[in-house]
């Protein structure tokens, strides 16, 4: 039975963007299968006492920008600290990823997730806009308009709710969040620890 890592994703998270490619590379290296779970982090914050960015204290908002600058420079990754279309709801993108996963598999959804996050944090695109999402999906080789339409179907909405409920039950409170062997790891800055857990399973 393949080793699995559950990946709770908020597509609008800059830290998910910074960690996404490294997560996929580590999973490939260690033969770990990623279970992608795009979720409603508004509901998760409500359940866990978290605050959306706009409601956080100014000190926390300022330090967040400093940390993002440090990490983007350290990793050598382009990142616009204050993109034009942020804050933005990640729900439309999350549901598109679920629709992609159902239609084309997890690898396709993971690849599209990377494209969506880069679109927000590097390319100044509005990932809350259906036409933008359709164009990104089409650029990835899919029928973007059909996937956006599918993202509002009952099956996708049901999965979105299920993933969110699972996250709350698993004590998730931030994104990105990774789970392996029932143990949670919050944030891309925990990827070293996560990779150690991957290696222990070999």
Predicted regions and their residues:
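C-terminal cap of thioredoxin/glutaredoxin-like
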Residues: 4-6, 12-32, 111, 115-202
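Structural alpha/beta surface segment adjacent to cysteine/selenocysteine redox centers
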Residues: 11, 17-120
